[in-house]
Amino acid sequence: MMKLENFVGMMTGHFDNKDQFNKMQAEGKIYPYAEHVNTICNDKINNLPEDFKGKFVVEESYYEINGKRHASPHLFLITEIEQGILLPSYEIPKGEDKNTFSYDSMKNVDYSKLEKSEKFTPALYHEKDGIWEGGSTSKFSSVMTFKLWEKFSNNFLEVSESMEVNGKRTFGYNEPIIYKRV
């Protein structure tokens, strides 16, 4: 369980890419200002099994480009397995607004009502020299692929994600978003 606690400690909190954003702006590159807020939410999940060792986390991602802000919330479960840390995605609970879902707005929900995402391939992370690294590739449909690759340390969160439709990228950037703890 030490690995789980170490991973959770690195990936939870409030992060932004202000330094990277300012550098990109100075270089004349179009790049989003991004915030990432990860909060453990087991306290809002009723009737967890007695021997439950995982940590549910609300991930709030906010992207701003050309003055337009977009929220992208998710619910994940962090579990420790023999191969490392596994991160399956769960559907935003029924009755919650998928566009504005956050830890603060989250209502208590029964564990039995949570639904694992069928589309997202659980991300697998490995630790090496104090840095957790991993991700997954998910087929959201026969033509839509989502790729996620992340690195976590005490100092930063590096996130590369892209969406491809028929092999053409429709979302994502050439360089990973580098978040620092706020």
Regions of interest found by a model, annotated:
Residues 1-14:
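N-terminal helix-cap/turn-to-beta initiation motif at the start of protein domains
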Residues 16-182:
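Soluble ligand-binding/transfer domains with enclosed cavities or grooves
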